[in-house]
């Protein structure tokens, strides 16, 4: 199936928001390779509406029984805030080469993988209630602070496995007191949640 392309020039933009709504599905987010582009988005039909205004790139899905597959590439010279509104299903966000201001899924995250970059300072990551099969991978030099509201099942934090944890959960990595990392807040009822560091390639 053919894909239609949306793009915009980067210009002198230094920070921007990507807002996807309602309900991202089968979406890949990664770094843009063309240095003069702010972003490039490609989607199968039915096409979502894509617009740029006031420092925000908006992707608005149309209501349809058909699932729209797509990808969004973000300029690696721009600091991005990513907001997924109305849920997220099968989202692969490889932001290892993209500076991140924050990452926010308001509800219903399912089968989401987020890979993030090295950084200075602390960056918030928020995953709304009812998250399932969510994986967050950071560089080994970056710290992590995890806060889960009212319990979690099948939680893995930096190699530590927990079958079920009742009540509020707070954990932090040994690197959490150093230069920076990721402040991860997850809503109630999380299942199959993994927070890990990236493995070094062999050889």
Give the role of each language-model region:
Residues 23:
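RNA/tRNA-interacting regions in translation and RNA-turnover enzymes
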Residues 26, 91-92:
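Short secondary-structure capping/junction motifs at helix and strand boundaries
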């Amino acid at each position: 199936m053919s894909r239609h392309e949306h793009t915009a020039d980067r210009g002198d933009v230094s920070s921007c928001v990507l807002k996807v709504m309602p309900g991202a599905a089968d979406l890949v987010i990664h770094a843009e390779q063309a240095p003069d582009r702010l972003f490039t988005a490609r989607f199968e039909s039915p096409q979502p509406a894509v617009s740029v205004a006031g420092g925000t790139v908006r992707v608005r899905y149309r209501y349809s029984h058909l699932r729209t597959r797509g990808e969004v590439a973000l300029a690696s010279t721009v600091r991005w805030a990513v907001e997924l509104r109305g849920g997220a299903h099968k989202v692969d966000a490889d932001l290892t080469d993209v500076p991140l201001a924050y990452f926010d899924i308001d509800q219903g995250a399912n089968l989401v993988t987020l890979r993030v970059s090295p950084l200075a300072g602390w960056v918030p990551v928020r995953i709304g209630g009812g998250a399932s099969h969510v994986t967050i991978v950071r560089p080994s030099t970056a710290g992590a602070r995890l806060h889960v509201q009212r319990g979690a099942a099948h939680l893995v934090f930096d190699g530590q496995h927990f079958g079920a944890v009742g009540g509020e959960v707070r954990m932090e990595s040994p690197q959490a007191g150093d230069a920076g990392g990721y402040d991860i807040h997850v809503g109630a009822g999380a299942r199959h949640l993994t927070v890990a560091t990236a493995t070094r390639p062999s050889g």
